[in-house]
Amino acid sequence: MTLNRRKYLTGMLALGLGLSLASAAHAITVKDDQGELTLDKVPTRIVALEFSFVDALANVGISPVGVADDNQPSRVIQPVRDLIRPWTSVGTRSQPNMESIAALKPDLIIADSSRHRAAYGQLSKIAPVLLLNSRYGSYNDILKQDQTIGDVVGKSTEMQARISQLQAKVKDIAKEIPDGQTAMYGSSRENTLDVHTQGTFAGSLLAALGFKVPQAEGG
């Protein structure tokens, strides 16, 4: 075997080892509402089935290729739209379109454990699914989920920095609110009124700001 051939083979082996080590370095296992999810590389084609997931991705400079935007791109608020590239609509959050999702060839789908659990089997045939509790998550739940998303997309440090900024802002606002104030957040539809207690995102955020927030019955 010639010296040049030995150098070539040695180089190819080193390259192969380097790629294997790089792949292993990107491998990650995270806990979600389905148990655990393991990915062997950082996903680059992500479909987000809730607005909060789009928000989390945008905060660390990641643009999803597909969004369940209820067929109305404007449902994604302007400050978030300003941070991401145009996406393909994959239907509504309550009924995402499986064909539209599959056509995008995603390498990760981020879904809600309440709204999309029944569709988990179908979704997981398309791509790995990260199942998180966005719809009924509290303020602290959402922060933890955002960090999980940051970990999965290889932006752990950036996400922690964004979360720290938000927590600092909440503390600053809380200092301006007099002690002993009570607050309740409600949302209304044509025939219903929903009250957001401490266990909800809005209610728990108000509590983090220092307000007294009613608990749910039995809570």
Language-model features, listed with the residues they occupy:
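Bacterial Sec-exported substrate-binding components of ABC uptake systems
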Residues: 2-52, 156-186
